Amino acid sequence: MNNDKEINSEKSKRAINHFSNKKEIKNSDRRGILFSKLPSQQLNPDRYDNLMTFWNNSLIDISKSCNILIFTPKLLSTYFTVENVSPIYLPLILNEMIKTKFIVKYEEYIKDYGWSKWVWTKMVVQPFQYYTGLSTPNTETEKNVKFILPEMIKDKAEQLYQHQLKNMNSTTDNIISYINLEKSIKDWYITREELDLLLLVLFRDSKVLILTNNKIKNINNNNNGEDRIGIKFAFDGEKVQPIQETDFGILKLQTTYETLKQQESKLLTDIEEISNTIKESIRIKQKNHALLQLKKKKLLESILEKRATASTNIHEILFSIESAKSNQQIIESLCTGVSTLKKVNQEISVDQVDSILDDYQDAITNQREIDDAMKSGFNSVESLSSADIDEDQLEKELDQMLQDHLTLEKEEKQKQKQIEKEKQQQQQPPTSQFNPNLPIPLKNEEDELLKELESLSVTSNPLPKQDENKQKTSELI
C-alpha cells in the first residue's frame, strides 16, 4: 500500500498536469490576465467576479479530478504554477474564499462539529493534529495552514458510504477493518488523514462508528491512528447501531480469515516452487536434494491443509453469526409486530366485535326488507296504471304511426329528387337553335312548315328589320 507521502506526490503531479492543460491557461495572454492582481470588488465588480469565478472553479476542478481533499496555500501555488510562473496574488484570492466560506480551515471545521465523545476525540482529532502539526507551532503558518472545501468533503464522504453499501451483502459486512477499507479505495489516492476526515463527516451523520483497540488506555499523539482497528457502517436508510462486544468478535474473525487466506496463497506459491526444484534435482540426478525438498513439500502441504481447514471453519462461523443475526432481526421484528398488535387489540374487545357484527347484520337485513318493499310497491303501481290499456290497440296504433312515417319519408325523398332535378335543368347551358341530333325534315314537311310560317306572319305585326333578316334567312334555308 502506498504511504501518504507517495500519494501526495502523485496527486501533486496530476494536479499540475491537469491545471496546465486547461484551455484558459494554455493561452499565455489569457493566463497573464488570470494571474494578475485581484481588483477591488467595489471599483471593478465585473473583473473581480470573473477572476473569483475562475479560481473557485479551478479549485473545485482539481479537487474532484485529483481527489485533493486537504490543501495548503503552498501546495496550491505549486499546483497552479505554469512554465515556472505562479499566481503571486493567490493569498489574496484565498482570503476572499475564506470570507465567503468557500474554503474553511479544517481545524475550525473539526471544532465546529462540537464532538464530545471520547472515542472520536482520541481516535481522530489527535491523529489529525499529528498529521498536520497543528499541535505544535509552525514557522510557516500562513503557507502551511490546511484548508478544505466543505461541499467537496460532504460529497466525497457520501461517495465513501455508498461505496461501502455496495459491499454490504450480509448482516456482518457492515463491519470492516480499517486496513481493508483503505485497500478498497486504493484507486482513490487519498491519504489516511483525508480518509479520517471523511469518516468524521459520516460519524456526524450517524453513519459510522469507530472500533478501537480497547487495550490502549492512553492515546499517544504519535500513534498515527493505528489504534483504529475497524469501522462499523450503518445499513442503508438506518442509523449506525451502537458498538457491541460481538462486533469486535466479528472483526477478529474477519481479520483471522483474511490472514489465513493470505497464508494459504503463500503456501501454494512455496509448494509450487519446491515442486519445480524437485523436478530439477531429479533431472540432474541429485537424489538426496530431491528427497529433502520432497519432505519440505510434504510439510508445507500439511500446514496448508490445516490452514485451509481453519479458514473453512472460521468462514462457517461467520456464516452462522450472519444467520443468527438475521434470526435476531426476524425475532425483533416479530416482537415489535406482536407488541403493536396487542396495543391495537387493547382498544377492541370480543364483545365489541360481536355487537358491531350483530348491528351490521340487522342493518343489512333491514335494508333488504326496505328494498323488497319498494320493489313490490313499484310493481303494484305499474300494474294498476296499465290495467285499462288495450295492448292490441296500442300495437295497431304504433304500426299505423310507423306506416305514416314511412310514407311521409318516401314523399319527402321524391320531392327532394324533383327539386334536385329542376336545379340541374336550370343550371344546364341554353341549347343552340340548330341541333344536329334533331331529324332533318322531309320536303312535304318543309312545305307545311312554310305555310304555317306564312300564316303566322300575316296575323302578326310587321317584324323589325333584324327579324326580317332572320326570316329571309329562314326562307333561304
UniProtKB/Swiss-Prot annotation:
Q: Look up the record and report any one GO term of the cellular component aspect.
A: mitotic spindle pole
Q: Which UniProt keywords apply?
A: Coiled coil, Cytoplasm, Protein transport, Transport
What InterPro entries does the record point to? Snf7_fam
Q: Which residues form a coiled coil?
A: 252-280, 382-428
Which residues lie in Basic and acidic residues bias regions? 411-424, 465-477
Report the principal subcellular site: cytoplasm
Q: Where is this region: Disordered?
A: 411-477
What the record says about family reads:
Belongs to the SNF7 family.
Gene Ontology terms: biological process? late endosome to vacuole transport; late endosome to vacuole transport via multivesicular body sorting pathway; protein transport; vesicle budding from membrane
Q: What is this protein called?
A: Charged multivesicular body protein 7
Q: Where in the cell is it found?
A: Cytoplasm
Function field: Plays a role in the endosomal sorting pathway.
The record, for Pfam families, names: Snf7
